[in-house]
C-alpha cells in the first residue's frame, strides 16, 4: 500500500507547489483510472489537446456534468486547463483535492507510477496457511490460502495472493499485485500479472507503459497450459467467477471479463476489452482492443473481432459479422469464383 504526501509528489516531479501549505500534507494512498478513483487516489485525464472544450464542455468522452462525480486526491490534467484552476482547486472538479495542470497528463501519470509505485511500494512478507501444500522447489514470497497447492517450480511473488483451495500445478508464475480467488486451477506455464504490451509517445521517443495495477481473478476459474494474463496500467485487469480458458490464451492489459466466460485454444483479447457475462470464443478467435463483447455472444473459430459485438448474437469471419450474413457472403464468393 502507498502512503505518500502531495508535497512529496510535487517535489519529486518538479511541479508547481500551491500557496496553501495546508494541502501539502494531504495523504495519497493509491492510484486508479478516472472513473474508479477514490478521494486519496492519483489519476489523470488527457482532455482535448486541440481545443479548450473538455472541462468546459465535452471531450475525451467525458462531459462537464460527469466531472462532478470524479473523486481523486491528485488529478493530472492538460496545461491548457490551468485557467480553470486556482491553487489546485477547480469548481469544475469539486471532489478533486488537487488539480495539477501539466504538459502531458499521461506522461505525468507514468512518471508517478515509476517513481512512487514501482520504486517505493512495499509488500508484507510471505504468509502460507498451515493447510497449504507447497512443493520444495517453489518460491513463495506472497500469501497462500488454506488448502491451496503450489506445485513444482512455481513462483508466487511479493504482493501476490493465492486464494483457498487454488492449485498452481507446475511452473506457474504469479507477479506482484495479483489476487486470485478460491478453487481456481492453473496448469503448467501460466503467467499472471506481467507487464502488458503498451507504449506511448513523448518528446519524440516511444516509451514503455508500466503496468503496475496487477490482476484480479475471481473464484472457480481454470487456466490451461501457457495462458498469459497481463497486468493493468492504473486499474487491474479483471476476470470474474467461473471463467475457463483453454491452452495458449492471451488476456491483455486492462481487460475486464465478467462471469461464466469460455475461451478455446489460441484465442485472445487485446488491451482494454470488456467481455460481458456468458461469452464464448471458439479456437483462434482474436479481438482488437478497446471494444465491448456483449453478454452471451458466441464467436466462431478463427474470427477476427474489429468492432464491439451486440449481446446475444453469434459471429464469424474476418472482420467478424453476424454468422448468417457471413455464411451468405461466403456462398456468394464461392459462386463468383466458379464463374
Residue locations for each model-derived region?
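Terminal amphipathic alpha-helical/low-complexity segments used for targeting or macromolecular assembly
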Residues: 1-131, 183, 189-190, 194-208, ...
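Structural signal for interior beta-strand "rungs" in well-ordered beta-sheet cores
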Residues: 44, 127-322
